[in-house]
């Protein structure tokens, strides 16, 4: 099933566990995964819900989904650094990710978190 950004945002606000189920499901489309990760990081405040989903999506096979997960990390961790394992994953992505856009975004996030 495909979801609009409006639907994903409504889920984040009203039923974040359902949003997480959707974006961690292997059958979800790239659009739902990407925008769902971004929305999750920006709309849901419970780290115990957000962090496991973003950790999973940072390792997704699709570069667009990984980029969305990084945007979600950036949105969720605006006021503090992410956990060390997420920083380690970003560091690995900044050098080893096959996508130049993902490498650049990972580098940018690491620079921001090291200020």
Segments from the language model and where they lie:
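Structural detector for internal amphipathic alpha-helices that build alpha-solenoid repeat scaffolds
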Residues: 1-12, 31-45, 67-81, 100-115
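A generic structural signal for ordered secondary structure
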Residues: 5, 60, 90-93, 97, ...
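Amphipathic alpha-helical scaffolding segments comprising HEAT/armadillo-like alpha-solenoid repeats
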Residues: 10-24, 45-59, 81-94
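Short inter-helical turns and helix N-cap capping residues of alpha-solenoid HEAT/ARM repeat scaffolds
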Residues: 27-29, 61-62, 98-99
């Amino acid at each position: 099933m495909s979801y609009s950004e409006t639907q994903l945002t409504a889920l984040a606000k009203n039923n974040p566990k359902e949003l997480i189920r959707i974006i961690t499901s292997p059958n979800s489309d790239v659009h739902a995964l990407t925008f769902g990760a971004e929305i999750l990081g920006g709309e849901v405040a419970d780290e115990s819900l957000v962090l496991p989903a973003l950790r999973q999506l940072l390792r997704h096979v699709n570069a667009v989904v990984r980029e969305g997960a990084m945007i979600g990390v950036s949105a969720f961790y605006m006021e503090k650094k992410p956990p060390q394992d997420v920083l380690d994953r970003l560091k690995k992505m900044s050098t080893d990710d096959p996508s130049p856009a993902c490498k650049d975004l990972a580098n940018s996030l690491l620079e921001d978190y090291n200020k």
